[in-house]
């Protein structure tokens, strides 16, 4: 999932590896929830702002740090990602959220997170069993396994599902 960010940031020589500690490498660029023993740069890719910041941070490792305008060009093909680079206000939608990665997204869209009197339960596909007895409307969001590895496409898919609730 980090490969697209590495490419966009301008890193030409890299190796994709699911187990960086088992291979030779100078630096692992990985998702923030991953842990390795070697030197690493942890990035987050759940929201458009996190994606933007991650591209910027990774580009600092190259001879040409990208400026904001150069990074914004990458967002031009992705209307939803571009729209949500800044947080929105949609607090009329009240949701219960069952995952930390989804909380980032829900806050960005502007929904109010609550454990009482909510309109929807937002959950990742791997927690489907946890919502079987819910009385509220449940909205399943695909986890990393079931969406594109391209972070822009992943944002478009997940946010597209949640935008229907506004």
Model regions and ranges:
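Generic structural marker for isolated residues within well-ordered, non-membrane alpha-helices
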Residues: 2-3, 55
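Binding-cleft/active-site segments that stabilize strongly anionic ligands or cofactors
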Residues: 3-48, 73, 77-166
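Ordered, amphipathic secondary-structure segments that act as subunit-interaction surfaces
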Residues: 48-74
